[in-house]
A protein has these predicted regions:
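Single-stranded nucleic acid-binding surfaces, predominantly the OB-fold ssDNA-binding core
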Residues: 1-114
């Protein structure tokens, strides 16, 4: 028998790359997007300390979108708890494209910027 239980959960702690861009649906729901940088530290092939930055696309709907618009700022350290969502589409040229985003279930500022 196949186990149908699964988990799609992401927890990221990083710095906001750009202040959220917010738009609203026809029914007034906020949709905010921003980038979040996380860093991985490890030795490179030469044995020297190295840093790799990974950029994540964050999508916040409804009350989380409103919160992001009002309180989240570029450079701020935040914790984002959410789930992965991958969208796929064809470009005008017929090329298959995809984008993976983290849909936020919560956004917690870890340092408050004025």
């Amino acid at each position: 028998m196949i186990n149908k239980k699964s988990i799609n959960r992401v927890i990221l702690v990083g710095h906001v790359g750009n202040s959220p861009e917010t738009r609203y649906t026809k029914d007034g729901r906020a949709i905010s997007t921003f980038s979040l940088a996380t860093h991985e530290f490890k030795k490179n092939l030469s044995g020297e300390d190295g840093e790799k930055t990974e950029w994540h696309n964050i999508l916040a709907w409804g009350k989380f979108g409103e919160f992001a618009e009002q309180y989240i700022k570029k450079g701020q350290l935040v914790c984002v708890d959410g789930r992965l969502k991958t969208s796929k589409w064809l470009s005008k040229e017929g090329v298959s494209l995809s984008k993976t985003e983290i849909v936020a279930n919560s956004i917690t500022p870890l340092d408050w910027k004025a």
